[in-house]
A protein has these predicted regions:
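A short, N-terminal "cap"/entry segment at the start of jelly-roll beta-barrel domains
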Residues: 1-50, 85
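Conserved short histidine dyad/triad with adjacent acidic residue
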Residues: 35-39, 52-69, 103
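A cytosolic small-molecule/anion-sensing beta-strand core signal
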Residues: 78-79, 94-95, 113
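Short acidic-glycine-tyrosine-enriched beta hairpin
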Residues: 87-103
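Ligand-binding loop in jelly-roll beta-barrel domains
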Residues: 92, 103-123
């Protein structure tokens, strides 16, 4: 496993302490080509040592097809609105909402508006 997020990056993926200015990181994601072409974009902020953290920006209507994580997860909606469907339960979540689910729970995420989410996966 690499300790860097992208080839040539100076930012380590884990360490004893890390700090992120999420507003700045979101701004960078929205400047990148994927977002400009109407696609979702993401960056792994931390990976390893028992915790993976991904910042995700989604366009309205974007969808993460049904899948399951191998470990428990939390999804914090920072901006916008999403629909989270897990095991027949539908939850519409907006800014300042935290959702969690256990390992192996199949789920789908749909952006109801442009959205910013912070995904944390244990393990």
């Amino acid at each position: 496993m690499s300790s860097r997020p992208h080839p040539g990056s100076e930012r380590p993926l884990h360490g004893p302490r890390q700090r992120f200015d999420l507003g700045t990181v979101v701004g960078r994601l929205m400047e990148e080509g994927a977002w400009q072409r109407g696609q979702r974009n993401s960056i792994t902020l931390r990976k390893g040592e028992g915790m993976n953290v991904v910042l995700l920006v989604m366009k309205a209507g974007d969808r993460l097809e049904e899948h399951a994580a191998l470990a428990p997860l939390s999804l914090s909606v920072r901006e916008g609105r999403i629909r989270f469907v897990a095991e027949e339960e539908i939850v519409e979540a907006e800014s300042d909402t935290l959702l969690t689910c256990d390992a192996g729970v199949r789920h789908t995420v749909v952006a109801l508006s442009d959205a910013v989410c912070l995904l944390t996966i244990a393990g």
